[in-house]
Structure formats: structure tokens, C-alpha cells
From Swiss-Prot:
Belongs to the ATG8 family. Its main location: membrane. One of its GO terms (molecular function) is microtubule binding. Keywords: Autophagy, Cytoplasm, Cytoplasmic vesicle, Cytoskeleton, Lipoprotein, Membrane, Microtubule, Ubl conjugation pathway. Residues 121-125 form a propeptide. GO terms for biological process: autophagosome assembly; autophagosome maturation; cellular response to nitrogen starvation; mitophagy. The keyword Plastid does not apply. SUPFAM superfamilies: Ubiquitin-like. This is Microtubule-associated protein 1 light chain 3 beta 2. A lipid is attached at G120 (Phosphatidylethanolamine amidated glycine). Ubiquitin-like modifier involved in formation of autophagosomal vacuoles (autophagosomes). Plays a role in mitophagy which contributes to regulate mitochondrial quantity and quality by eliminating the mitochondria to a basal level to fulfill cellular energy requirements and preventing excess ROS production. GO terms for cellular component: autophagosome membrane; cytoplasmic vesicle; endomembrane system; microtubule. It is a lipid-anchor.
Amino acid sequence: MPSEKTFKQRRTFEQRVEDVRLIREQHPTKIPVIIERYKGEKQLPVLDKTKFLVPDHVNMSELIKIIRRRLQLNANQAFFLLVNGHSMVSVSTPISEVYESEKDEDGFLYMVCASQETFGMKLSV
């Protein structure tokens, strides 16, 4: 099975910067987030999309619930959202704060989802 290209591999830096500019212009209260499955992940299903526009008032626990629902995970299935491939942030942190401190130079906030088996490893996005 060929490995899936990441969002950064599919879009040039210039395209991503323009994407963010248009998103922020059209949706000033939304945070542009890219969520991809950790490349070595075996337990979690693949998300049906990678680009999310998250309302800026949402906290991390709400985002986790949304992604769990999209993945159709059971309550007992382990699931972690890692910011920039390595940071776990408090579930009470508003996404707007995470965005300001962790956004990429292209303007997107990158996250990877992983099951417990990858917890604690440095992940590359």
C-alpha cells in the first residue's frame, strides 16, 4: 500500500499560505487546523478529511470529542491529538491559544492523531 502524502507534501508553502489567508478572510472566527493520522498508526481509522475550520472558542476537549466522533471510536479506544507532532496540550485550553502558540509558519495548526501505542514518541508531521 503506497504511503499517503501529507498535507504539506500535497500543497506548496505558497498555496498553504494563500489557503490560510482566504480562510481567515472569509471565516475570521475559525482556526484552520490540519489533522492527520500518525504515519505509523495501525489502530485508528483514517479521517475522511484533513482540513478543519474550528470555531476559535472551542477548547481542546471539544475538538477531541469531534474527532473521536468522526473516527467512530468506542469509548474504550485510546486516542491522542498531538500538536505539531509532539505536544499534548491541556484539554481545557482554547484552540485559539493553541493556535497562537503552535501555528506553523504557513498559518495552519498541525495535529496528528495517534493511539496509545505511539504515546510518548516524537512524531514527525
